């Protein structure tokens, strides 16, 4: 899957090998990005982060990052607009919260698009999800029993989000099952 964008009358800058920038053609440019060759790793243990080709992705806002974290935790199942609103904006009037949520989702999608990985998002009317086939996640691999990921769990799962605490008993039980020990 690739994408093609036509940019008209925009001066385009290209990073040079020595870290400088040089202007490219002004006029119509077709930008093609092959997103098949992008490696995406999502880390949930000891904090939530997303890596694209080994580099940490920075998010436009903490709410955009948390929104993605919620979708990742649901492992491909959809999160309704109401659920997402409650988790991100618990103490805000519903209409305002839903408007905020739309803006946050737009920013998240644009940020992921800048890195060629917006394909991980699935948006349907009134619900949000991630396509779990598009990335590797320590949480998913741990649940599958992948030995390379079992040792990564140190008892901490997205500690920056209070709602993630509900998953810890399940993860600790799995860890005990895999290792025959306590954590």
Regions found by a protein language model. Name each.
Residues 5-183:
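Intrinsically disordered, low-complexity protein-interaction/activation regions
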